[in-house]
From Swiss-Prot:
Binding-site residues, L-aspartate: 119, 204, 259
Gene Ontology biological process terms in this record: 'de novo' pyrimidine nucleobase biosynthetic process; 'de novo' UMP biosynthetic process; amino acid metabolic process
Entry's family note: Belongs to the aspartate/ornithine carbamoyltransferase superfamily. ATCase family.
Subunit structure: Heterododecamer (2C3:3R2) of six catalytic PyrB chains organized as two trimers (C3), and six regulatory PyrI chains organized as three dimers (R2).
The organism's taxonomic lineage, starting at the top: Bacteria, Pseudomonadati, Pseudomonadota, Betaproteobacteria, Burkholderiales
Keyword Transferase: yes
Protein name per its UniProtKB record: Aspartate carbamoyltransferase catalytic subunit
TM region positions: none
A single Gene Ontology CC term: cytosol
GO molecular function: amino acid binding; aspartate carbamoyltransferase activity
Length: 343
């Protein structure tokens, strides 16, 4: 499903670019209220460090909820959260549903395949109808970059929008849970060297992580991957680019591995998965090039034997499953914060 500038189902080539949605019809920062509080979470880009830290601090308070016998707090009691996933997702949709339920919200998961959008209704008409049902918060995943911005501009004033991933553009809650994970294990962002490895070209997670890391003051962010899978402009963002995995991993404190997003590739950008693993897969031998206490992360889904060896994924330096656990607390924090702010 893609949208043109009117929000109707359309040709992928006609889908609006992220820049249009960030800088076209929206002025200022569309995520913030007039008082500078977070009303929507659409992207980490442009958020002040104070808001990012506020989200991480709030998430820390929610982590303990997971260990309680009754895993609920009444923060969103009486609120309705609509999960609108126009792209398939298991992990993200499930963690948002768990997070909303633990905040005592009423949760609706829209069945996109059976919805009016699959029958030709425009995206904006769908959003307007759902707003009329007195939804309080939309969690949106969409194949078109910028779709959550379009929804945030046109939904009812009382509705809040959280971007759960839009095209190649952004995945802000994944970026935030990655930052929470790093902070949990490393504490001081200003002394870290962080490597992001793999298919950065097609990764909305990589973009969100880069913006979050630079916002939080990480002095050295490295992008490591084959030339065909690295976007232009990384150096302008302050990122060091490496085309050799062994060189790029030397001395890093955090390694974020990315899967190959074959569904977003339009041509033969790489050889076989086996050849990719030989050159770009994270093995125990390559992990040894990093700092002795380096942590290994992955946003999932993980392809063992392609971008990461099972010994690394299941090893003592892997914090991949903890990312999932922390993700619930981070998404609770985001929903709780945005739902409490309005113009």
């Amino acid at each position: 499903m893609t949208t043109d500038t009117t929000g109707r189902a359309g040709n992928p080539a006609a889908a609006a670019s992220p820049d249009r949605f960030r800088y076209g019809f929206l002025k200022g920062n569309p995520q913030l209220t007039k008082n500078g509080e977070l009303k929507h979470l659409l992207s980490i880009e442009g958020l002040p460090r104070s808001i990012v830290n506020h989200i991480l601090d709030t998430a820390e308070q929610f982590v303990s909820v997971t260990d309680r016998e009754v895993k609920k707090v009444p923060l969103l009691r009486g609120k309705s959260v609509f999960n609108l996933f126009f792209e398939n997702s298991t992990r993200t949709r499930t963690t948002f549903e768990i997070a909303a339920t633990r905040l005592s919200a009423d949760v609706l998961n829209l069945n996109i395949n059976a919805s009016s959008t699959s029958k030709g209704e425009s995206l904006l008409d769908t959003i307007n109808n759902l707003s009329a049902m007195h939804a309080d918060l939309f969690v949106v995943r969409h194949a078109s970059s910028g779709a959550p911005y379009l929804i945030a501009e046109h939904c009812a004033p009382h509705v809040h929008v959280i971007n759960a991933g839009d095209g190649r553009h952004a995945h802000p809650t994944q970026g935030l849970l990655d930052m929470y994970t790093i902070r949990h294990y490393k504490r001081d962002f200003t002394k870290l060297r962080v490597a992001i490895v793999g298919d950065i070209l097609h990764s909305r997670v990589a973009r969100s992580d880069i913006h979050a890391l630079t916002t939080l003051g990480v002095p050295e962010v490295r992008a490591i991957g084959p030339r065909t899978l690295l976007p232009g402009g990384l150096e302008q963002m302050g990122v060091k680019v490496f085309h050799n995995l062994d060189e790029g991993l030397k001395g890093v404190d955090v390694i974020i591995m990315l899967r190959l997003q074959n569904e977003r590739m339009s041509g033969a950008l790489l050889p076989s998965a086996q050849e990719y693993f030989k050159t770009w897969g994270l093995t125990p031998e390559r992990l040894a090039l990093a700092a002795p206490d380096a942590i290994v992360m992955h946003p999932g889904p993980m392809n063992r034997g392609v971008e990461i060896d099972s010994q690394v994924a299941d090893g003592p330096q892997s914090v991949i499953l903890n990312q999932v656990t922390f993700g619930i607390a981070v998404r609770m924090a985001v929903m709780g914060i945005v739902a409490g702010n309005s113009d």
